Amino acid sequence: MAQAPAKCPSYPGSGDGEMGKLRKVALITGITGQDGSYLAEFLLEKGYEVHGIVRRSSSFNTGRIEHLYKNPQAHIEGNMKLHYGDLTDSTCLVKIINEVKPTEIYNLGAQSHVKISFDLAEYTADVDGVGTLRLLDAIKTCGLINSVKFYQASTSELYGKVQEIPQKETTPFYPRSPYGAAKLYAYWIVVNFREAYNLFAVNGILFNHESPRRGANFVTRKISRSVAKIYLGQLECFSLGNLDAKRDWGHAKDYVEAMWLMLQNDEPEDFVIATGEVHSVREFVEKSFMHIGKTIVWEGKNENEVGRCKETGKVHVTVDLKYYRPTEVDFLQGDCSKAQQKLNWKPRVAFDELVREMVQADVELMRTNPNA
């Protein structure tokens, strides 16, 4: 079985204790990413003091959280405070955790691109796998085992070559990438700390979740950006990989709420977060073009397949084998029944609405800044 049962007696903030009610201090790794930015917004609205760990960069990489500064122009911090750090540096993690003394830690930082993990396999293992251990060890070193709750961003890529449909918490894992393998280690080390040290630690097994803040090198955002450019006359054609890969796509904004709910639960448990609906990359393309008034018809097979505009006859989509993964994951569909029952969580944003929001946002972005 994939999931190990939780067997811990008592945890911070559970029951009627005062722990956690007085201080609401969250530390987020990966705060500058899609999920981190939505989570920071969500927690600030709930009255948290939010701390984020950011990697040092030659240029500011805080675009997704600029609006959360007290003074965005001057980068003056309010209830959101940023710390330079890295999941590969255990010393800095101990220093930050000891200084902040968070009540909740959300580990969202990762090299999260599956295809790139084949090129950066060792780095992906160091950040996504061992980086999680470094964080957990830092909690122990700082003596915060009994006062902090830990959320680990797990992934549907753990299921890889799926052993059953749909996938739930007890479905056996079969990762098909260095990313999935690194996240598998992270999953089990979280379970181990939960059982060995009674740490309130959970894995959120999140299926694909997108938004206008999705990174430009992820397939959904590549599609929405390219379609927006075609609509504005800035581009004629773009290339994709496996058009028939099927995914369970939700909205990141819905999924960060589930992260928080897991840490408010009385007992630490692992949860699958998903919509239960499956759509192909091909469908995502078709829906995206529909929102700019174009109908895509497909011609040819395999790498010779193209997507042609029915109205104009122009080819807008081609297939390029370089975008295929060495080992493909063809089908992912999550069963979030447990989260619905125990967390009272369910997705709000439907697939069509998600696609429309992404395309509209990218049309506005490309209209004002074509090189964004």
UniProtKB/Swiss-Prot annotation:
Residues carrying N-acetylalanine: 2
List of residues binding NADP(+): 30-35, 55-58, 86-87, 108-112, 123, 183, 209, 214
CC cofactor: NADP(+)
Keywords per UniProt: Acetylation, Lyase, NADP, Phosphoprotein
EC numbers: 4.2.1.47
Entry GO CC: cytosol
GO biological process: 'de novo' GDP-L-fucose biosynthetic process; GDP-mannose metabolic process; Notch signaling pathway
Phosphotyrosine found at: 323
Reaction catalysed by this enzyme: GDP-alpha-D-mannose = GDP-4-dehydro-alpha-D-rhamnose + H2O
Gene3D superfamilies named among the record's database cross-references: NAD(P)-binding Rossmann-like Domain (3.40.50.720), UDP-galactose 4-epimerase, domain 1 (3.90.25.10)
Activity modulation notes: Inhibited by GDP-fucose.
Pathway(s) it belongs to: Nucleotide-sugar biosynthesis; GDP-L-fucose biosynthesis via de novo pathway; GDP-L-fucose from GDP-alpha-D-mannose: step 1/2
Pfam families the UniProt entry points to: GDP_Man_Dehyd
GO molecular function: GDP-mannose 4,6-dehydratase activity; identical protein binding; NADP+ binding
Source organism superkingdom: Eukaryota
Active site: 155, 157, 179
Function comment: Catalyzes the conversion of GDP-D-mannose to GDP-4-dehydro-6-deoxy-D-mannose.
Family to which this protein belongs: Belongs to the NAD(P)-dependent epimerase/dehydratase family. GDP-mannose 4,6-dehydratase subfamily.
Protein's recorded name: GDP-mannose 4,6 dehydratase
Organism taxonomic ancestry: Eukaryota, Metazoa, Chordata, Craniata, Vertebrata
Gene: Gmds
